[in-house]
């Protein structure tokens, strides 16, 4: 089956893991994603409805605009994907405009440009909340028109929310399945390149996420979580059924260090969850 690509480039995107995720994702009527990111899982599954959330307000605003004003958005965004805009001077002008703009539609248009023309498809903000990714110097950035239209079509059955993982997981009902793709736990104390946006995800939040998953499965709502395979993640997910997968990093802070690392898919499923350890 042909895989559908997201219209955004995204650090930690789940496109390479789709087959593994779909293999272990339980069936249900509604998919809840508290960390939707670029939406690769949403775009490649067939639930009748979706609840998609992220803490990044720019991302959720963009998705709602693409959903509701598709043609207008595609036309406006296409105008920025021309040879004249592919230079550092224009990029930094657009980046400054994005950071100063209060217009949601214009910000959404600029967000796609910055995503495709910026370095490595990163989405990163400084402590003042300003987008600060440098110019990427790509020969000819791709305008994802087909991907935008496919996203907009699928989005008619989706609701997008800018909120915390706890709030979006609270929306799950007995017809729901939850897939969580949190910012990954660091492989080591010095390897935390996973702070992709201003909100760093703490170890306490990682453990809290697992606690919420345990609570949901007690209500017969299955949860699948992806993360690095470390001693900590195995401790957090000790009540889940663990599946180990290898994935090649698609975005790296050092282009020469893209290698396969072990990742975990932790499945909390009624009847499969281990009893709590005393």
Swiss-Prot record:
Disruption phenotype: Cells are filamented, accumulate DNA double-strand breaks, have viability defects at 15 ng/ml ciprofoxacin. A double deletion with priB is seriously disadvantageous to cells. It holds the Pfam family MethyltransfD12. It comes from the Bacteria. GO terms for molecular function: S-adenosyl-L-methionine binding; sequence-specific DNA binding; site-specific DNA-methyltransferase (adenine-specific) activity. The keyword Transferase applies. Its EC number is 2.1.1.72. It catalyses: a 2'-deoxyadenosine in DNA + S-adenosyl-L-methionine = an N(6)-methyl-2'-deoxyadenosine in DNA + S-adenosyl-L-homocysteine + H(+). PROSITE patterns: N6_MTASE. Changing residue 136 to A: About 33% methylase activity, binds SAM normally. GO terms for biological process: bacterial-type DNA replication initiation; DNA restriction-modification system; DNA-templated DNA replication; methylation; mismatch repair; response to UV. Keywords: DNA replication, DNA-binding, Methyltransferase, S-adenosyl-L-methionine, Transferase. The keyword Transcription does not apply. Disulfide bonds: none annotated. InterPro entries: Ade_MeTrfase_dom_2 (IPR023095), DNA_methylase_N6_adenine_CS (IPR002052), M_m6A_EcoRV (IPR012263), MeTrfase_D12 (IPR012327), SAM-dependent_MTases_sf (IPR029063). NCBIfam families: dam, PRK10904.1. Although it shares sequence specificity with a number of type II restriction endonucleases and methylases, it is thought to act in methyl-directed mismatch repair, initiation of chromosome replication and gene expression. Genetic interactions among priB, dam, lexA, nagC, polA, rdgB, rdgB, rep and uup link the PriA-PriB replication restart pathway to DNA double-strand break repair. Belongs to the N(4)/N(6)-methyltransferase family. This is DNA adenine methylase. The gene is dam.
């Amino acid at each position: 089956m042909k895989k559908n690509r997201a219209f955004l480039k995204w650090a930690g995107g789940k496109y390479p893991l789709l087959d593994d995720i779909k293999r272990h994702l339980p069936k249900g009527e509604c998919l809840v994603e508290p960390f939707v990111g670029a939406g690769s899982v949403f775009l490649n599954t067939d639930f009748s409805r979706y609840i998609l959330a992220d803490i990044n307000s720019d991302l959720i605003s963009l998705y709602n605009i693409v959903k509701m004003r598709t043609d207008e958005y595609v036309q406006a965004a296409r105008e920025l994907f021309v040879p004249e805009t592919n230079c550092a001077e224009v990029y930094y002008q657009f980046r400054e405009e994005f950071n100063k703009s209060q217009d949601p539609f214009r910000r959404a248009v600029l967000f796609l440009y910055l995503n495709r023309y910026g370095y490595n498809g990163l989405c990163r903000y400084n402590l003042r909340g300003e987008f600060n990714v440098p110019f990427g110097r790509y020969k000819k950035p791709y305008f994802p028109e087909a991907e935008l239209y496919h996203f907009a079509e699928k989005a008619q059955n989706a609701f997008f929310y800018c909120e915390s993982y706890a709030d979006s997981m609270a929306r799950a009902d007995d017809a729901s399945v939850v897939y969580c793709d949190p910012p990954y736990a660091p492989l080591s104390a010095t390897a935390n390149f996973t702070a992709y946006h201003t909100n760093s995800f703490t170890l306490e939040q990682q453990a809290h996420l697992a606690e919420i998953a345990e609570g949901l499965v007690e209500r017969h709502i299955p949860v699948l979580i992806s993360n690095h395979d470390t001693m900590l993640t195995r401790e957090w997910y000790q009540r889940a059924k663990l599946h180990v997968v290898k994935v090649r990093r698609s975005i790296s802070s050092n282009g020469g260090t893209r290698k396969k690392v072990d990742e975990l898919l932790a499945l909390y499923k009624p009847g499969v969850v281990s009893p709590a350890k005393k």
